[in-house]
Amino acid sequence: MKNSLKILCSESFTSVSAPVQYAAVEAYRGDHSTYLNGVNKILSFTANYVYENLKSNLINISKPEGGFYLFPEFTNAKFLSSSEMCKDILDKTGVALLPGSDFGLDTARMIARLSYTDFDGAEFLSNTLGRKKLDKADLEKYAPNIVYGVSKLKDWSN
């Protein structure tokens, strides 16, 4: 009986139910290009802002190509592990990063995963949707935690 129940639960809880699948088909119909272009514009601008502001402060960081994360390496940080470094950053700046070792990177390298999505995306999008370009004032208004966090990381890394 236990084995039968495990099989039943596996089929019930590991797949999306049929009603949800049908709803998704309806939700994905239509042209979503305006939304997607707006979201891509915001994420690209935010990622490049973080990159441009951190790369000049003894931080090795790859130019963003998409996604939601950057992996800065703090070359002047002297800790035994990236976990220890991330704890120090959190304690001293209030900025939360995940250690690179959590993602299979060498624990001795001072690499962390940084998410640049700490903002209300719906608000940001609705207020900038018709615009061709974004600027720092947009980040200060709609993503102030990003601007603040980058500033704190720059100060910490010096």
Residue ranges of model-derived segments:
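PLP-dependent class I/II
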Residues: 1-158
